UniProtKB/Swiss-Prot annotation:
Oxidizes mannitol to mannose. Provides the initial step by which translocated mannitol is committed to central metabolism and, by regulating mannitol pool size, is important in regulating salt tolerance at the cellular level. SUPFAM superfamilies: GroES-like (SSF50129), NAD(P)-binding Rossmann-fold domains (SSF51735). It comes from Stylosanthes humilis (Townsville stylo). Pfam families: ADH_N (PF08240), ADH_zinc_N (PF00107). This is Probable mannitol dehydrogenase 1. Keywords: Metal-binding, NAD, Oxidoreductase, Zinc. One of its GO terms (biological process) is lignin biosynthetic process. Coiled coil: none annotated. Binds 2 Zn(2+) ions per subunit. The gene is CAD1. Zn(2+) 2 binds at residues 96, 99, 102, 110. Its EC number is 1.1.1.255. It catalyses: D-mannitol + NAD(+) = D-mannose + NADH + H(+). Zn(2+) 1 binds at residues 43, 65, 158. The keyword Ligase does not apply.
Length: 354
């Protein structure tokens, strides 16, 4: 297969340290869209992958699956996009397109996904958005609404859809209902914004008292519940209709279940490193539901982007240069970011030190 020279930053071993890296991309074919990458969000998955925390990283690896940019070339069969379009690429760049999941526009649940980076694909391996350009099948390219900024919109392609999809699927959108958002990070801060746009009462549940002002005054939550205060947790028993749990650290589910009303729903989207204990009694006694969710399919992700454009929803970001990525990864490991790092790829990659 013909290829084109590309440039980005890659991790070359499990130290997770990223450095400049020359590699090749496949050339644009009939169904492909080539985009110049302007911005790329920094996701927790990037951190886990560069350090091989999940045990399946193949080095060298260029991370990044929150990609926003401009179309520079389209293949002869491409009808949805044209040069100059503002577009994005999320977590996957291909799927089998034949299974039941793919036929239902749920490519994120396909048993044979091709991830945007670190996946075998057509005799090579995919590389992500910490780079100058990418070539993607048109089915896996998303259109940005004109009023949605590319830099603050990029994290929506993973963090945004990861909370939007379960809120829609599990019916956590009824105006006037009470939503608890457990954890205030990259996922949680977007969940607050979606909740308010759906007309919900939103309470942030966090063990960090210093996050109260940020949750209410900056992000627009209605209230704050300090989960490390037993008395406040007891007082909030049975007050919430839904909880979306974005916490990635090991934590108690029983305390969250106690906050739910009869028929309440707890949906987990965080990925703790160790299994959580599942308490059955409160599920049975309160006819409560606990569920999970992956990121959404392409149709739903486009719906989410359009929703964000309509309601002026974007991530709160800290824009960084490409050569600041190692510091950003270290800070991310300590949850030291409000609330998503985004790399200013187009304005900093070419000037990165070799």
């Amino acid at each position: 297969m013909a290829s084109s020279k590309a440039f980005g930053w890659a991790a070359k071993d499990a130290s997770g340290h990223l450095s400049p890296f020359h590699f090749t991309r496949r050339q644009n074919e009939a169904d492909d869209v080539t985009l110049k990458i302007l911005y790329c969000g920094v996701c927790h998955s990037d951190l886990h992958t560069v350090k091989n925390d999940w045990g399946f990283t193949t080095y060298p690896v260029v991370p990044g699956h929150e990609i926003a940019g401009i179309v520079t070339k389209v293949g002869s069969n491409v009808t949805k996009f044209k040069e100059g379009d503002r577009v994005g690429v999320g977590v996957i760049v291909d799927s089998c397109q034949e299974c039941e999941c793919c036929q239902q526009d749920l490519e994120s649940y396909c048993p044979k996904p091709v991830f945007t980076y670190n996946s075998p694909y057509k005799g090579t391996r995919t590389q992500g958005g910490y780079s100058d350009f990418v070539v993607v099948h048109q089915r896996f390219v998303l259109q940005f609404p004109d009023n949605l900024p590319l830099d603050a919109g990029a994290p929506l392609l993973c963090a945004g859809i990861t909370v939007y999809s379960p809120m829609k699927y599990y019916g956590m959108t009824e105006p006037g209902k009470h939503l608890g958002v457990a954890g205030l990070g990259g996922l949680g801060h977007v969940a607050i914004k979606f909740g308010k746009a759906f007309g919900l009462k939103v309470t942030v549940i966090s063990s960090s008292p210093n996050k109260e002002s940020e949750a209410i005054d900056v992000l627009g939550a209605d209230s704050f519940l300090l989960s490390s205060d037993p008395e406040k947790m007891k007082a909030a028993t049975g007050t919430m209709d839904y909880i979306i749990d974005t916490i990635s650290a090991v934590h108690s589910l029983v305390s969250l279940l106690g906050l739910l009303k009869l028929n309440g729903k707890l949906v987990t989207v965080g990925l703790p490193s160790k299994p959580l204990q599942l308490p059955i009694f409160p599920l049975v006694a309160g006819r409560k539901l606990i569920g999970g969710s992956n990121f959404g399919g392409l149709k739903e992700t486009q719906e989410m982007l359009d929703f964000c454009g309509k309601h002026n929803i974007a991530a709160n970001i800290e824009l960084i240069k490409m050569d600041e990525i190692n510091t950003a990864i270290e800070r991310l490991s300590k949850a030291d970011v409000k609330y998503r790092f985004v790399i200013d790829v187009a304005n900093s990659l070419s000037s990165s030190n070799m």
